[in-house]
C-alpha cells in the first residue's frame, strides 16, 4: 500500500471524508503542498501527526475545503434562474430549496435576496450545507468584505445589507431568517427529500466520475417531480436522462 493510500485510510477514520472519491492528482498536490509547509516528509508522517494533533487536523480540513465564493457568481445564470427557472417550479406552496456545499454563505444569501424580490411567491425555506464548520460559522454571521459584493446590484446592496463601521457589509435579518445552515458531507450523509430546487455549483469538478454519478443520482432522487438541479458553469451533465433529468436551460436540469 503506498503512503497516499495509508493517508486516505487514516483520513477517513479521523474525519469521515473519503478522499478516494476526489480526483487524486488534484488532492495530492494540495495535500503535499500543505504537509511540506508544515515540515513533514511524507503522507505517512503527516497522517501520524494528524492523529495526535486536533488543531492540525482542523486546519488541514479547512485548507482542503474549497471556499471560493461570491454573491451572484456568474450573474447571467442567476438571471436565467429568475426569469426562466422559477416559473417552472413556482407552486402555491412555499419553495423548499437546498444550497449544497454552500461554503461561506454567499450562494444561499444570493438565493434568498432573489426570492425575496419575487411577487406572488408564497414563501421559501433554504437549507444551506457544507462540510467545513469554519465556513458555516462565517456563513451564519453573514458579514462580508466589499470585494465579495462586486456583482451585487446597488439596489440589492442598499436593500439587503447594512454597512458596518469597518466597511464590511452584513446581511439583514429579514434575509437570514429563511436560511438554515447545517454541516453535511455530500458523499456520506443522508439527503433530505422533496426539494423544488437544488443549487450545487463548482463542486462536481473536484470529484471522480463515479462519485459525480452517485451525487447526480442522489440529488435527482431528492428533487420533487419537476424540481430543478442548478450546477456550475463548467459542470454540464452529459446524458442527464440517465439520472432522470432533462435539460431545462444551460446548467439547469429538471426532474421528470
Swiss-Prot record:
SUPFAM superfamilies: Chemotaxis receptor methyltransferase CheR, N-terminal domain, S-adenosyl-L-methionine-dependent methyltransferases. Monomer. S-adenosyl-L-methionine binds at residues 67, 69, 73, 107, 130, 185-186, 201-202. Methylation of the membrane-bound methyl-accepting chemotaxis proteins (MCP) to form gamma-glutamyl methyl ester residues in MCP. CheR is responsible for the chemotactic adaptation to repellents. Keywords: Chemotaxis, Methyltransferase, S-adenosyl-L-methionine, Transferase. Pfam families: CheR, CheR_N. Gene3D superfamilies: Chemotaxis receptor methyltransferase CheR, N-terminal domain, Vaccinia Virus protein VP39. PROSITE patterns: CHER. One of its GO terms (molecular function) is protein-glutamate O-methyltransferase activity. Its EC number is 2.1.1.80. This is Chemotaxis protein methyltransferase. It catalyses: L-glutamyl-[protein] + S-adenosyl-L-methionine = [protein]-L-glutamate 5-O-methyl ester + S-adenosyl-L-homocysteine. It is an enzyme of class 2 (transferase). The keyword Magnesium does not apply. SMART domains: MeTrc. Residues 1-256 form the CheR-type methyltransferase domain. It comes from Bacillus subtilis (strain 168). The gene is cheR. GO terms for biological process: chemotaxis; methylation. InterPro entries: Bact_Chemotaxis_MeTrfase, CheR_C, CheR_MeTrfase, CheR_N, CheR_N_sf, SAM-dependent_MTases_sf.
Amino acid at each position: 500500500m503506498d503512503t497516499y493510500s495509508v493517508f486516505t485510510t487514516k483520513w477517513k477514520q479521523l474525519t469521515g471524508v473519503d478522499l478516494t472519491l476526489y480526483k487524486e492528482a488534484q488532492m495530492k498536490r494540495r495535500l503535499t503542498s500543505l504537509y511540506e509547509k508544515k515540515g513533514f516528509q511524507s503522507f505517512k508522517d503527516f497522517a501520524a501527526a494528524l492523529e495526535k494533533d486536533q488543531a492540525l487536523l482542523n486546519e488541514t480540513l479547512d485548507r482542503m475545503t474549497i471556499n471560493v465564493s461570491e454573491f451572484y457568481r456568474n450573474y447571467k445564470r442567476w438571471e436565467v434562474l429568475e426569469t426562466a427557472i422559477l416559473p417552472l417550479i413556482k407552486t402555491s406552496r412555499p419553495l423548499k430549496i437546498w444550497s449544497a456545499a454552500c461554503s461561506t454563505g454567499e450562494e444561499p444569501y444570493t438565493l434568498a435576496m432573489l426570492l425575496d424580490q419575487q411577487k406572488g411567491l408564497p414563501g421559501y425555506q433554504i437549507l444551506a450545507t457544507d462540510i467545513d464548520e469554519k465556513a458555516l460559522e462565517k456563513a451564519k454571521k453573514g458579514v462580508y468584505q466589499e470585494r465579495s459584493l462586486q456583482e451585487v446590484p446597488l439596489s440589492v446592496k442598499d436593500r439587503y445589507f447594512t454597512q458596518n463601521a469597518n466597511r464590511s457589509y452584513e446581511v439583514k435579518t429579514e434575509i437570514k431568517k429563511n436560511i438554515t445552515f447545517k454541516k453535511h458531507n455530500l458523499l456520506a450523509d443522508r439527503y433530505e427529500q422533496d426539494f423544488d430546487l437544488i443549487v450545487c455549483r463548482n463542486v462536481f469538478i473536484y470529484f471522480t466520475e463515479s462519485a459525480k454519478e452517485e451525487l447526480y443520482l442522489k440529488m435527482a432522487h431528492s428533487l420533487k417531480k419537476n424540481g430543478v438541479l442548478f450546477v456550475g458553469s463548467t459542470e454540464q451533465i452529459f446524458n442527464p436522462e440517465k439520472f432522470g433529468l432533462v435539460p431545462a436551460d444551460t446548467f439547469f436540469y429538471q426532474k421528470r
